[in-house]
Amino acid sequence: MVKVESFELDHTKVKAPYVRKAGIKIGPKGDIVSKFDLRFVQPNKELLSDKGMHTLEHFLAGFMREKLDDVIDISPMGCKTGFYLTSFGDIDVKDIIEALEYSLSKVLEQEEIPAANELQCGSAKLHSLELAKSHAKQVLENGISDKFYVE
């Protein structure tokens, strides 16, 4: 099997919440694409709820783009501990943290979930505003760091 960057990370030595630049790729035409690990909860200790994580995905899709022009995608991790963000350009981790703090703060102000209907969402019933707010609040209270390894 090809070496996968995320499998090389020692998950026993990280301290969530954090943002980590997981890699940069340069395409054949010179396009730069960055990938970030937005870790919300501690691997192998905590999980984001399915409904809360799905709702956060909907909010982050919009709010992160309010602060970052070159977002390609934000996707939930299969391990349910955070999200991956991909963007064009070599963006600084501090800019991602600032956008994420802004986005999670905006989640706390919301009263309805964007695109939570069968026309716009493939799992429209798998949402919870309450759980999304709870996850956002927890991450903000714990503070998002750019230092991800425990010393």
Curated annotation (Swiss-Prot):
UniProt entry keywords in alphabetical sequence: Autoinducer synthesis, Iron, Lyase, Metal-binding, Quorum sensing
GO biological process entries: quorum sensing
Iron in keyword set: yes
EC number assigned by the record: 4.4.1.21
Record Pfam families: LuxS (PF02664)
Names of required cofactors: Fe cation
Keyword Nuclease: no
Highest taxon above the source species: Bacteria
Catalytic activity: S-(5-deoxy-D-ribos-5-yl)-L-homocysteine = (S)-4,5-dihydroxypentane-2,3-dione + L-homocysteine
Cofactor remark: Binds 1 Fe cation per subunit.
Binding site for Fe cation: H54, H58, C121
Any one GO molecular-function label of the UniProt entry: iron ion binding
HAMAP family according to UniProt: LuxS
Function: Involved in the synthesis of autoinducer 2 (AI-2) which is secreted by bacteria and is used to communicate both the cell density and the metabolic potential of the environment. The regulation of gene expression in response to changes in cell density is called quorum sensing. Catalyzes the transformation of S-ribosylhomocysteine (RHC) to homocysteine (HC) and 4,5-dihydroxy-2,3-pentadione (DPD).
Stated family: Belongs to the LuxS family.
Description of how the protein assembles with itself and partners: Homodimer.
Name of the protein: S-ribosylhomocysteine lyase
